[in-house]
Amino acid sequence: MAAFKATFFLLLVVCAMVITTTEAGVRVRPCDQVCSRIDREKDECCRAHGYSGHSSCDRGRMTCY
């Protein structure tokens, strides 16, 4: 029973982390134009708009976290 509780708890923690990570990414339209540039410039654009850094660029759409 203790193993079941521990497994359930770990699964719950992992699910919470996935949900939090998914919600953290925000599209920043002004940064779309820097998607083709180096990572440092992408991070700078996201920081200039109040985010910690860039998460990804997908089809020319910048996602910041």
Swiss-Prot record:
Family: Belongs to the asilidin-1 family.
UniProt keyword annotation of Transcription present: no
Protein name: U-Asilidin(1)-Mar3a
Gene3D superfamilies associated with the record: Diapause-specific peptide
Disulfides per UniProt: 31-46, 35-57, 45-64
Principal localisation: secreted
Pfam families to which the protein is assigned, alphabetical: Antimicrobial_6
Subcellular location: Secreted
UniProt keyword Signal present: yes
Function of the molecule: May act as a neurotoxin.
Organism: Machimus arthriticus
Distribution of this protein across tissues and organs: Expressed by the venom gland.
Annotated domain remarks: The presence of a 'disulfide through disulfide knot' structurally defines this protein as a knottin.
Signal peptide extent: 1-24
Molecular-function annotations in GO: toxin activity
GO CC term (a single one): extracellular region
Keywords recorded for this protein, A-Z: Disulfide bond, Knottin, Neurotoxin, Secreted, Signal, Toxin
